[in-house]
């Protein structure tokens, strides 16, 4: 603050044209000072600033290149994932369709096998019934025959006496003898 006060004190004592003094025109002074400072900065700082800007530019370009490479890699991975997803979806649809076809085929096979089993079971049942019927009929015939034979034997035993028995034997011997004689003639 003291320097500022001294500056204003010297304003009153402006030296003549050939001497060194204080320029009181603030705008002109700042402009000259700024020009000198900027000139010095440009002269000395130009290389440093250029190197800093070049390094910054190289880092930015390198970051952009890396980002582009990452973007390309990500796009490639995304495309591969999409292709893989499409393949998986197609396989899933194929498995689904094959599964439905296989289920329908197995269902038809099961129905056919069940139908065949039922037909065979029906045939076996009918055969069993037929054989049981035949067996029952044979048993009935056998009982009827046995009863008829027993009845006939009972009737014959009650009707036959010894004399009738001898006559029947002689008649049968005569029939057998005549059959034997005819046979010898032929």
UniProtKB/Swiss-Prot annotation:
Q: How does it sit in the membrane?
A: Single-pass membrane protein
Subcellular locations according to the entry: Plastid, Chloroplast thylakoid membrane
Q: Name one GO cellular component term.
A: chloroplast thylakoid membrane
From the UniProt annotation, give the residues forming the signal peptide: none
Q: Does the keyword RNA-binding apply?
A: no
User: Which family, according to UniProt?
Assistant: Belongs to the ATPase B chain family.
The entry's other comment says: In plastids the F-type ATPase is also known as CF(1)CF(0).
* Subunit architecture: F-type ATPases have 2 components, F(1) - the catalytic core - and F(0) - the membrane proton channel. F(1) has five subunits: alpha(3), beta(3), gamma(1), delta(1), epsilon(1). F(0) has four main subunits: a(1), b(1), b'(1) and c(10-14). The alpha and beta chains form an alternating ring which encloses part of the gamma chain. F(1) is attached to F(0) by a central stalk formed by the gamma and epsilon chains, while a peripheral stalk is formed by the delta, b and b' chains.
- What is this protein's name? ATP synthase subunit b, chloroplastic
Gene it is expressed from: atpF
